[in-house]
Amino acid sequence: MSIEINNLSLGYQDKLVVKNLSLKFPKNKVIALIGPNGCCKSTTLKAVARLLKPKQGSITHKGKDIWQKSPKEYAQELAFLPQQHLVPEGIKVQELIAYGRSPYLNLWGKLSQKDEELVTWAMAQTQTAELAEQLVSDLSGGQQQRVFLAMTLAQDAELVLLDEPTTYLDLNRQAELMGMMRQMQQNGKTVITVLHDLNQACRYCDHLIVMKKGAVMAQGTPDEVMTEELLKDVFDLDVIIHRDPISNTPMFILK
């Protein structure tokens, strides 16, 4: 297993929103956390990214509690693209993407040849090379999203967390992003993402984790998980399930 959550409770101030959650994320898969708004998908992802400390329980990676790892060690293992970004003023696109290499820099902070190659590769993957000298703050929302994705790719971590990564992206860019997730998996990485589009989740993801009110309702492959009964129970949706003619995965049409 890539990441294991054991008896985890999470909360903000004195309010618990996740109680006694236990969950295993399979290695080398594209995994989607899905569920209605407020079901704690992003909260769970933040805990795995070490942005939210558990009230109780543990999260382990490679058998070691993630809070026992140094920030640099964990940043070499895990890259996280949050749902919302703080866009720094006065920084150019290529500079921001190069920040993805920060966990690997020496005391002098100089990029190695490998670092520079990974930055160039990440820009090519996200089609941001033509934006390299522009200020990030001057870009559109969709362009900024691609730049932050490039920074995440440049980090070259084996575990990649993407919180609602299709935000601000048009349909063409969304399809490209989904293709990149598949490519990362084929290159040996584990991708965990929060998605709202159920048809996208079924077409592009190997493993689905369905959440409701901070609890896991079901998990498995799209064919194992996505039933008309579950969609009614979790999302209050009345649907007809067909087969996607492209991927042969479940596809949903509202009644």
Where are these regions (language model features)?
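Conserved ABC ATPase signature
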Residues: 110, 135-139
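The feature captures the beta-strand-to-loop junction immediately N-terminal to the Walker
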Residues: 34-36
